């Protein structure tokens, strides 16, 4: 087989076979196929697309390019959730303990975040003492015992995806649905998931800004999962404004604690219940989505979700008393209110710009080397559709520097107020299974 023939085949709009896809991925991972040929193929895929079978074969070739995590010693169906990312997306912190409290095993591998705030691990590390440095055996034992544990990403998972992703980034071939779908699904499958729930975001703060693109990506990922024997369901949710109120690490942990008590922001709590009920249903702990949701609402009400969170934190060295006393979380030196300059209704909160403002305070990383300030961030006091009076707080800024004019300016530019009432956006657009 010659790579040039395969590039030509895809350029002319033909489907590649399983053997051809394996040849490409193995050769590229080993370094036998140079970047310039892989770039040409990526661009051919960008314009010509791939059918469902090719996309599934590409996914599995990337899974087999490196190590895979074996979770077979964990009892039950392992369901993983993936969000395509957004601002203030704390769902993992709530969903883990919430579904674990009704018996769904949560074996979560998480990363540290690049971007507006930290990743799940950074957020959890704002709990004093909490750590993810546990061995694979400890990880599996903890999940069997408490139904939940979180470990840092390790091992050589999907090296083909890492290499191809870096190449796509610099060759203008990121926005190809088969390439995005196979990239996301290969990571989830390599990490040992039996079933997968996807939260595909759409709107200005999302990677897929257009609803039709978001639907196409969701359908592609659900199709891959079902073709390779991993039951997969997707939800398409709104990211035109940040989710919940908190943007920042310790601030999001506090919001997660409130939500586990059933006292969280309405939109955030609803999304957690919808995603969670899909996880419980796929784990075969409930016979319908309605029954699953009822179980989760009960776990919030009777305190078992919160207790599971405490047990989880303590098992990994964390001070679980932060759950009852959030003042033990890292605290910012300065608390500054951003006041509304006029009466009216909040008409727009540009999610990614608000995320950038939180990052300027130190809540996120610009590069892998940056340090992160776990205490700082923003808490929205109003969401789209809310009425506001002049002088009322729009956002509370938690900062470790006194002077925050740059952050205020950014927020004023990106939180718009209209004289006439505004409808709050739809939270969930579609469900795909």
From Swiss-Prot:
Q: Cite the Pfam families for this sequence.
A: Glycos_trans_3N (PF02885), Glycos_transf_3 (PF00591), PYNP_C (PF07831)
Q: List the catalytic activities from the record.
A: uridine + phosphate = alpha-D-ribose 1-phosphate + uracil; thymidine + phosphate = 2-deoxy-alpha-D-ribose 1-phosphate + thymine; 2'-deoxyuridine + phosphate = 2-deoxy-alpha-D-ribose 1-phosphate + uracil
Q: Which InterPro entries match?
A: Glycosyl_Trfase_fam3, Glycosyl_Trfase_fam3_N_dom, Glycosyl_Trfase_fam3_N_dom_sf, Nuc_phospho_transferase, PYNP-like_C_sf, PYNP_C, Pyrmidine_PPas_bac/euk, Pyrmidine_PPase_CS
> How cofactor binds (record note)?
Binds 1 K(+) ion per subunit.
Enzyme Commission number, as recorded: 2.4.2.2
* GO biological-process terms attached to the record: pyrimidine nucleobase metabolic process; pyrimidine nucleoside metabolic process
The protein's GO terms of the molecular function aspect are: 1,4-alpha-oligoglucan phosphorylase activity; deoxyuridine phosphorylase activity; metal ion binding; thymidine phosphorylase activity; uridine phosphorylase activity
Alphabetical keyword list: Glycosyltransferase, Metal-binding, Potassium, Transferase
Q: Which residues bind K(+)?
A: 88, 90, 243, 246, 255
Give the cofactors, semicolon-separated: K(+)
For this UniProt entry, what's an example GO CC term? Answer: cytosol
Keyword Membrane belongs to the record:
no
Quick one: which residues bind phosphate? Answer: 81-83, 92, 108-110, 120
Query: Where along the chain is substrate bound?
Result: 168, 187
Which Gene3D superfamilies does the UniProt record give? Nucleoside phosphorylase/phosphoribosyltransferase catalytic domain, Pyrimidine nucleoside phosphorylase-like, C-terminal domain, Transferase, Pyrimidine Nucleoside Phosphorylase, Chain C
Q: Which family does it belong to?
A: Belongs to the thymidine/pyrimidine-nucleoside phosphorylase family.
The role this protein plays is: Catalyzes phosphorolysis of the pyrimidine nucleosides uridine, thymidine and 2'-deoxyuridine with the formation of the corresponding pyrimidine base and ribose-1-phosphate.
Q: What PANTHER family does the record tag this protein with?
A: THYMIDINE PHOSPHORYLASE
**How does it associate, per the subunit comment?**
Homodimer.
Kindly provide the name given to this protein in its UniProt entry: Pyrimidine-nucleoside phosphorylase
UniProt lists the gene as pdp
């Amino acid at each position: 087989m010659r790579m040039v023939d395969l590039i030509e085949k895809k350029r002319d709009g033909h489907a590649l076979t399983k053997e051809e896809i394996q040849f490409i991925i193995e050769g590229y991972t080993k370094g036998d196929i140079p970047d310039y040929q892989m770039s040409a193929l990526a661009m051919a895929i960008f314009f010509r697309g791939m059918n469902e079978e090719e996309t599934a074969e590409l996914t599995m070739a990337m899974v087999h390019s490196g190590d895979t995590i074996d979770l077979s010693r964990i009892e039950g169906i392992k369901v993983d959730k993936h969000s395509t990312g957004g601002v203030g997306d704390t769902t993992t912190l709530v969903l883990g303990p919430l579904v674990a409290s009704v018996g769904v095993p949560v074996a979560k591998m998480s990363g540290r975040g690049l971007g507006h705030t930290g990743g799940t691990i950074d957020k959890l590390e704002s709990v004093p003492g909490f750590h993810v440095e546990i061995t694979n055996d400890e990880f599996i034992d903890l999940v069997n015992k408490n139904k939940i544990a979180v470990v840092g990403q390790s091992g050589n998972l999907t090296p083909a995806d890492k290499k191809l992703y870096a190449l796509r980034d610099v060759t203008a071939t990121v926005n190809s649905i088969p390439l995005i779908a196979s990239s996301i699904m290969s990571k989830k499958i390599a990490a040992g998931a039996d079933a997968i729930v996807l939260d595909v975001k759409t709107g200005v703060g999302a990677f897929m800004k257009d609803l039709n693109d978001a639907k196409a990506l969701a359908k592609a990922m659900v199709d891959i999962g079902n073709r390779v024997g991993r039951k997969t369901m997707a939800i398409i949710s709104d990211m035109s404004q940040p989710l919940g109120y908190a943007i920042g690490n310790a601030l999001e942990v506090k919001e997660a604690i409130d939500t586990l008590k059933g006292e969280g922001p309405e939109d955030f709590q609803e999304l957690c219940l919808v995603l969670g009920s899909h996880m419980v249903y796929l784990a075969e702990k409930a016979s319908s989505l309605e029954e699953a949701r009822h179980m989760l609402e009960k776990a919030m009400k009777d305190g078992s979700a919160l207790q599971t969170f405490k047990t989880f934190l303590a098992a990994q060295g964390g001070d679980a008393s932060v759950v009852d006393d959030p003042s033990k979380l890292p605290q910012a030196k300065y608390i500054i209110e951003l006041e509304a300059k006029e009466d009216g209704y909040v008409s727009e909160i540009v999610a990614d710009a608000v995320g950038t403002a939180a990052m300027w305070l130190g809540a996120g990383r610009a590069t892998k080397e940056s340090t992160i300030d776990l205490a700082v961030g923003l808490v929205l006091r109003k969401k789209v559709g809310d009425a506001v009076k002049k002088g009322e707080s729009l956002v509370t800024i938690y900062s470790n520097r006194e002077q925050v004019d740059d952050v205020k300016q950014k927020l004023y530019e990106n939180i718009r107020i209209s004289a006439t009432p505004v409808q709050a956006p739809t939270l969930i657009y579609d469900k795909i299974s």
